[in-house]
């Protein structure tokens, strides 16, 4: 490897750090320099000169953590971010927490004050090791540079093995500068028994699951982010092809199954499709693959899939039975489990019962009765129209989103491939979408990357336009601008007596077109149907970055919606269009 050509017998801790991450295949990091991490950035200068690695200079450390997160989600590799001590390190916390709850392997490397100053409340000293313990798989403080290579190797192992997640390495300034006789720990040399994925792939559980599938007349596959991480899309397709089982996904599982398929019901849960929610309420067998049974999916938990037996497959034993006790619990990787299950089903194939045909017909009727609707306004454009048109123009794009109404509409109306959907699901982090688009675009420089944001979310990290401009990243930014904190307004309207406390965003709102142009980024304002499609077409064709300020209907609500404390079958906003108003809507089935 190239890095071996510049190894001598005596090296510094900072050299050991960079050499170790390069040995693990890292070619991009996202970071921001500062006092305690300056020795590492000084070393980085030489490594970049040799084209061994490249730092993407973000405008805020939160942007670095989100970019590393999206880099990982879109590639399956470990994303790496750098920050200095104190406020630099604490600025990473939201991004680390986002990665933790969504099981994303990122490695956060922070500078720290020198060892003699730790515990003295030195300038920019913060116990980032302690702060991050609840939101990482593991944290390290490097006390001796001789441990650096081993710690990095362990960190990469921990990030990826078992249920993925973030790891933090805190590097005191003087550790980076200290010289020692360097010997590298190569990738693959580290084995940590506690991080090995547990597995109970016993023939008894697989056999029970197979029998339940063969006996079910109303089965449903409920698929989460664990299946994406496992790259299980091909094996899941085989299972669906064999037994014609309908598929619904979580927000994290979106893209695991062909969204144009007649068997795909789209997302379930609070803002899921009506037919997915009806299906989960009526199924007699729920096959959960890499999903957590979280509150946004289940609604009222004791009424979730209350008619169903449950098979739950997850790599994390802590998730199995946490919220819903399954009849069959299988701890293991989704691909491995479904492969074993499929082999057994093929060897003992029994034609699926005729009742499954009536189950499919029933779901088809729900689709026809309660489709997703795209409102067509006479004087303005709806958010749904923007998203449907964008998807038609960019069918193979990577989509990142922020959090709020636009995120839920995107989940409803965008059809994506596996690992092409990048969104903060568990933590719901506003400001995620723009830096996430940076990470995805750096990972896939020749692919189309689109950031769908809201006017409120966008303002959380809009400084990252500077990063996009600096590196000429051809990201397309679609702002769904309704001049509100849209989801907050919707909840205030529905549950807080229409008291709109601090959710209006008109006063002090920037002109997004001029803002982008100030960074040298091409921008359009889209405010009517006449210029909507042409502006979107021009944006997708343009070779550089583009921002579109899409000024949409202000008071559009995101439906269907399962209200707090209600079951998934008790959705609001799913009434069929009244007679005579059909021309005001376009049906959009997933």
From Swiss-Prot:
<dbReference type="GO" id="GO:0030976">
    <property type="term" value="F:thiamine pyrophosphate binding"/>
</dbReference>
<keyword id="KW-0150">Chloroplast</keyword>
<keyword id="KW-0100">Branched-chain amino acid biosynthesis</keyword>
<keyword id="KW-0028">Amino-acid biosynthesis</keyword>
<keyword id="KW-0786">Thiamine pyrophosphate</keyword>
<feature type="binding site">
    <location>
        <position position="61"/>
    </location>
    <ligand>
        <name>thiamine diphosphate</name>
    </ligand>
</feature>
<keyword id="KW-0934">Plastid</keyword>
<dbReference type="InterPro" id="IPR000399">
    <property type="entry name" value="TPP-bd_CS"/>
</dbReference>
<feature type="region of interest" description="Thiamine pyrophosphate binding">
    <location>
        <begin position="405"/>
        <end position="484"/>
    </location>
</feature>
<feature type="binding site">
    <location>
        <begin position="314"/>
        <end position="333"/>
    </location>
    <ligand>
        <name>FAD</name>
    </ligand>
</feature>
<dbReference type="InterPro" id="IPR039368">
    <property type="entry name" value="AHAS_TPP"/>
</dbReference>
<dbReference type="InterPro" id="IPR045229">
    <property type="entry name" value="TPP_enz"/>
</dbReference>
<dbReference type="GO" id="GO:0009507">
    <property type="term" value="C:chloroplast"/>
</dbReference>
<dbReference type="GO" id="GO:0000287">
    <property type="term" value="F:magnesium ion binding"/>
</dbReference>
<feature type="binding site">
    <location>
        <position position="163"/>
    </location>
    <ligand>
        <name>FAD</name>
    </ligand>
</feature>
<comment type="subunit">
    <text>Dimer of large and small chains.</text>
</comment>
<comment type="pathway">
    <text>Amino-acid biosynthesis; L-valine biosynthesis; L-valine from pyruvate: step 1/4.</text>
</comment>
<dbReference type="InterPro" id="IPR029035">
    <property type="entry name" value="DHS-like_NAD/FAD-binding_dom"/>
</dbReference>
<comment type="pathway">
    <text>Amino-acid biosynthesis; L-isoleucine biosynthesis; L-isoleucine from 2-oxobutanoate: step 1/4.</text>
</comment>
<dbReference type="Pfam" id="PF00205">
    <property type="entry name" value="TPP_enzyme_M"/>
</dbReference>
<dbReference type="InterPro" id="IPR012846">
    <property type="entry name" value="Acetolactate_synth_lsu"/>
</dbReference>
<feature type="binding site">
    <location>
        <begin position="271"/>
        <end position="292"/>
    </location>
    <ligand>
        <name>FAD</name>
    </ligand>
</feature>
<keyword id="KW-0274">FAD</keyword>
<dbReference type="GO" id="GO:0005948">
    <property type="term" value="C:acetolactate synthase complex"/>
</dbReference>
<dbReference type="Pfam" id="PF02776">
    <property type="entry name" value="TPP_enzyme_N"/>
</dbReference>
<comment type="similarity">
    <text>Belongs to the TPP enzyme family.</text>
</comment>
<dbReference type="GO" id="GO:0003984">
    <property type="term" value="F:acetolactate synthase activity"/>
</dbReference>
<keyword id="KW-0285">Flavoprotein</keyword>
<dbReference type="InterPro" id="IPR012001">
    <property type="entry name" value="Thiamin_PyroP_enz_TPP-bd_dom"/>
</dbReference>
<feature type="binding site">
    <location>
        <position position="455"/>
    </location>
    <ligand>
        <name>Mg(2+)</name>
    </ligand>
</feature>
<keyword id="KW-0460">Magnesium</keyword>
<keyword id="KW-0479">Metal-binding</keyword>
<dbReference type="InterPro" id="IPR011766">
    <property type="entry name" value="TPP_enzyme_TPP-bd"/>
</dbReference>
<keyword id="KW-0808">Transferase</keyword>
<dbReference type="InterPro" id="IPR012000">
    <property type="entry name" value="Thiamin_PyroP_enz_cen_dom"/>
</dbReference>
<protein>
    <recommendedName>
        <fullName>Acetolactate synthase large subunit</fullName>
        <ecNumber>2.2.1.6</ecNumber>
    </recommendedName>
</protein>
<dbReference type="InterPro" id="IPR029061">
    <property type="entry name" value="THDP-binding"/>
</dbReference>
<dbReference type="GO" id="GO:0050660">
    <property type="term" value="F:flavin adenine dinucleotide binding"/>
</dbReference>
<dbReference type="GO" id="GO:0009099">
    <property type="term" value="P:L-valine biosynthetic process"/>
</dbReference>
<dbReference type="GO" id="GO:0009097">
    <property type="term" value="P:isoleucine biosynthetic process"/>
</dbReference>
<dbReference type="Pfam" id="PF02775">
    <property type="entry name" value="TPP_enzyme_C"/>
</dbReference>
<feature type="binding site">
    <location>
        <position position="482"/>
    </location>
    <ligand>
        <name>Mg(2+)</name>
    </ligand>
</feature>
